[in-house]
Amino acid sequence: MGAKKNLLAELREKSSEELDEFIRDNKKALFTLRAEAALQNKAVKTHQFSLYKKSIARALTIKQEKKDRVHG
């Protein structure tokens, strides 16, 4: 639970551009993981799919919160 709180605090400190970069990097890693799972016959740690997706969702949520704070 502590790691999640640290990630959230870290994401809240980032600028919009840094959040975009974080999202892009996580999407790229998720794509690579999916390709690795589909194209290779080696075992893939399937829990990483949900970790990447949740990290992306958290970053998008924080980005939306910042946008709402500015406009609302």
Curated annotation (Swiss-Prot):
It comes from the Bacteria. CDD domains: Ribosomal_L29_HIP. GO terms for cellular component: cytosolic large ribosomal subunit. One of its GO terms (molecular function) is structural constituent of ribosome. Transmembrane segments: none annotated. Pfam families: Ribosomal_L29 (PF00831). Gene3D superfamilies: 1.10.287.310. The keyword Ribosomal protein applies. The keyword tRNA processing does not apply. Keywords: Ribonucleoprotein, Ribosomal protein. InterPro entries: Ribosomal_protein_uL29, Ribosomal_uL29, Ribosomal_uL29_CS, Ribosomal_uL29_sf. GO terms for biological process: translation. HAMAP family: Ribosomal_uL29 (MF_00374). PANTHER family: 60S RIBOSOMAL PROTEIN L35/50S RIBOSOMAL PROTEIN L29, LARGE RIBOSOMAL SUBUNIT PROTEIN UL29C. Belongs to the universal ribosomal protein uL29 family. This is Large ribosomal subunit protein uL29. It comes from Chlamydia muridarum (strain MoPn / Nigg).
